[in-house]
C-alpha cells in the first residue's frame, strides 16, 4: 500500500481523474475510525465503499492523483 496515497486520503484530499470522472475520497464521518472506508465515485454515481487499503490500490491502478471533485471541491471534509 502506498503510504503517501493513504495519508492523502486520511487528510481529506480527494484523488481524482476528472477526464474519466473517477474519484476516491474519505468522508468526514470516517476520520479517526479504526477501519476507515473510502467512497469511490464513477461518472457521478457512487460505485461503492472501499476499505482504505483497497481504495489506495484502486487509486494506483486508475492512476488517480489529488484533484477537484465537482461538488466537494479539493477536500472531502
Give a label for each model feature.
Residues 16-57:
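Acidic, low-complexity, intrinsically disordered interaction modules
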Residues 1-17:
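Negatively charged, low-complexity tracts enriched in Asp/Glu with abundant Ser/Thr
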Residues 6, 12, 27, 52-53, ...:
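Non-transmembrane, interaction-prone segments in cytosolic or luminal domains
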Residues 44-77:
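Mixed-charge, Lys/Arg-enriched low-complexity segments
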Amino acid at each position: 500500500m502506498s503510504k503517501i496515497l493513504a495519508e492523502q486520503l486520511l487528510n481529506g484530499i480527494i484523488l481524482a481523474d476528472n477526464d474519466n470522472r473517477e474519484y476516491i475520497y474519505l468522508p468526514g464521518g470516517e476520520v479517526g475510525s479504526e477501519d476507515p472506508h473510502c467512497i469511490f465515485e464513477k461518472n457521478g454515481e457512487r460505485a461503492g465503499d472501499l476499505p482504505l487499503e483497497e481504495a489506495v490500490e484502486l487509486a494506483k491502478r486508475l492512476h488517480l492523483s489529488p484533484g477537484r471533485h465537482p461538488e466537494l471541491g479539493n477536500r472531502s471534509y
